[in-house]
Amino acid sequence: MTIEQANQYFAALPDGFASTEQLRTAFTATVQKVQFVGVAGTAGKTVTARLLAAILHAQGIHAGLYHAGCRPLSERICIDDAPVDEGLLALTADALSAAEALPQDAAELAAAANCFGAAGCTLAVVELPDAGLAEALPGMPVCAVTSVGPDGVSRSVERLAALAAGVMRKESICVTAPEQPKSVLSELIVAAGKCGCELVVPDPEDITFLEAEKFASKVDYGGYTVPLAFLGRHAAGSAAMAVELSLALCRKGFDITDDAILEGLAAVENRSSIRVISQRPLIILDACRTPQQAAALLRVLNMAKVRHMSAIIGLVEEEGAEAFFSALETGLTPEEQKKDKSTMPGMSENPFDKVYLVTPAGGDDEMTARLTEKAKYHF
């Protein structure tokens, strides 16, 4: 295969679930020599994985990085902070296509792991859209569960937390996000206790914002001073997780210095799904899709003192829309709104003067009308 054919092969694979045995069978022998850090959760997986990989690179550890997502796979597998060798990935795709077909998530993870094994990586940081795939990975001294919240598939946050906890294993150290909902944290504590995994929760009180500009800030976490690309506790929480993951790896025998942690955190440019496309006029693109992510976006804009903006919101379904609009209006998640009785729909001060709703072309006109009415209730 060419690299274009390899990317097309993985992109065309169907969704679905693979058994642990199926995935293990797809691994080459060299994968057994790689230690993995699995990253599960609803939001923040990409940034947390990227930050940790940057720290490993700064330390000089021969490490791989795999991001889940929809970009071509060749752009989502990195080794030593550089895209994977195209010839290596093409050969890996050839081998996988000749064996038993796997669903897309499992096939991508197998391809990434096989590339890391062939390259002789010591460590590899991998995003896990399905935490159940973690069981097939040979060694995982440290793992992570990022922020857990509604995913638009009508599953409770407790159920989502239990699924994300599938990344844990006996005698591993799992770092989770600060300020998880109580119900989520309870599920993670129970899961960690059952499998004999140590759970580390960064203390939100250890996060201190030292200075702030319009779209940048400097944060101290436990003595580590970190420049962040954006304001907001979500970015600071991801940095705190990366620090704790590095310290956990130190406890597992890896040598990671404080200087490497600081250098790695400072080196990463894209730390969030929020992207500033233009400063003048100010144009921001955010891939938020959950109430938690909508609240995080609003908090960033409020901290930056941005006003008189227009928002263009694209929705493909009605499920979860009410909670999303409410969080984008108030900056509060559904759990926080239950505690704060002072918030009334349509009465909160926020950055948006106008809000435009966009739904897929050729979609359900009645659904669009219902979504519009929901939006009018808040803006």
Predicted regions and their residues:
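Short functional linear segments
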Residues: M1-G41, T48, A54, A58-Q59
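Aromatic/hydrophobic pocket-lining residues that form π-stacking "cages" and hydrophobic walls in ligand
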Residues: L52, A112, L188
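ATP-dependent carboxylate-amine ligase catalytic core
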Residues: A58-P141, V153-V157
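Beta-strand->loop->alpha-helix junctions that form or flank phosphate-binding loops
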Residues: Y66, T176-E179, A191-E213, A229-R233, ...
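Nucleotide phosphate-binding/pyrophosphate-handling subdomain across enzymes
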Residues: L123, L133-A144, V148-G152, R159, ...
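C-terminal helical cap/extension that packs against the catalytic core
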Residues: E179-G196, L282-I284, F325-F379
